[in-house]
């Protein structure tokens, strides 16, 4: 399918352009991370990382986007704090997450929702004199210290995953291929971070699941190409390494593209049919899968070729 492109479009020779394109897409994520130590935050950090209050209510009404937006406005008006997320849960239940609210503000939120949606507060009785259960299902606070612990654990997990991948690739191929793969993985992670900023997706423990999933998906796509490069090196001994890399990329392009399309079809259906909490996982996953396809084809191999060339 892509055999004709092998001679018409040399990926290694075009790396300056392809690498710049990748850098542009990753730039928002890179800048957002760099600015964090300077108290400039573009991310929508959830209470999992910062601490805060989680409130769950049964609204007894269908919760579409308009209703969720209305609930978010009611919460902000009542508490003076914009919620970090308002998500539909089971049935007609809604989960609201904010920065830490004291008892007075939590009561104000419930009063506002009670008035707007005729919620039960646990004092009303039915026709038989039985108390009707309250529609305030739960209120939980996450301590900021616990949030910091979760954040640190997440960073360590991602770092260890990348380190293990680097060691594995360096052993299986060579250390330069390991560096090339890490550069591609970094590209994917920063692109995903940019998606979190653009779509204002809450950054919580789901973020770690997304990142680790993308790392695994991307490294698998990269290893497929690296395997083909290694096999071609055994056969094409008189061919330059750059040409071998280019040939190997286009030889595996059909497989890479088909795998990505198949995965996107499945994940896309989940994004369309799933509730908002699932969509917050799936949307950055879709972005990461596409970024992984790009980096495995147009970043990792060319960087490996450049490192080989510069080491001679």
Could you tell me what each predicted segment is?
Residues 1-312:
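A structural signal for conserved, well-ordered secondary-structure elements
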């Amino acid at each position: 399918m892509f055999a004709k492109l092998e001679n018409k479009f040399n990926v290694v020779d075009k790396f300056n352009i392809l690498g710049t394109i990748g850098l542009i897409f990753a730039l928002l994520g890179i800048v957002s991370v760099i600015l964090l130590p300077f108290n400039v935050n573009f991310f929508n950090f959830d209470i999992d990382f910062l601490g805060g209050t989680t409130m769950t209510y049964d609204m007894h009404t269908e919760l579409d986007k308009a209703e969720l937006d209305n609930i978010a406005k009611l919460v902000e008006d009542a508490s003076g704090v914009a919620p970090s997320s308002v998500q539909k849960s089971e049935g007609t239940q809604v989960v609201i997450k904010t920065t830490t609210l004291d008892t007075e503000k939590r009561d104000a939120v419930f009063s506002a929702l009670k008035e707007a949606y005729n919620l039960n507060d646990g004092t009303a009785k039915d026709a038989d004199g039985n108390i009707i259960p309250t529609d305030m299902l739960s209120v939980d606070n996450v301590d900021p210290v616990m949030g910091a612990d979760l954040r640190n654990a997440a960073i360590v997990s991602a770092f260890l995953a990348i380190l293990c991948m680097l060691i594995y690739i360096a052993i299986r191929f060579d250390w330069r291929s390991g560096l090339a793969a890490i550069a591609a993985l970094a590209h994917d992670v920063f692109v995903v971070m940019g998606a979190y900023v653009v779509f204002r997706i809450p950054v919580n423990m789901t973020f770690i699941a997304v990142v680790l999933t993308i790392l695994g998906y991307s490294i698998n796509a990269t290893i497929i190409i690296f395997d083909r490069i290694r096999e071609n090196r055994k056969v094409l001994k008189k061919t330059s390494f750059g040409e071998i890399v280019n040939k190997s990329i286009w030889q595996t392009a059909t497989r890479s593209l088909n795998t990505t399309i198949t995965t996107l079809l499945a994940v896309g259906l989940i994004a369309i049919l799933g509730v908002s909490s699932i969509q917050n996982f799936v949307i950055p996953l879709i972005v990461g899968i596409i970024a992984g396809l790009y980096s495995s084809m147009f970043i990792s191999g060319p960087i490996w070729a450049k490192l080989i060339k510069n080491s001679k």
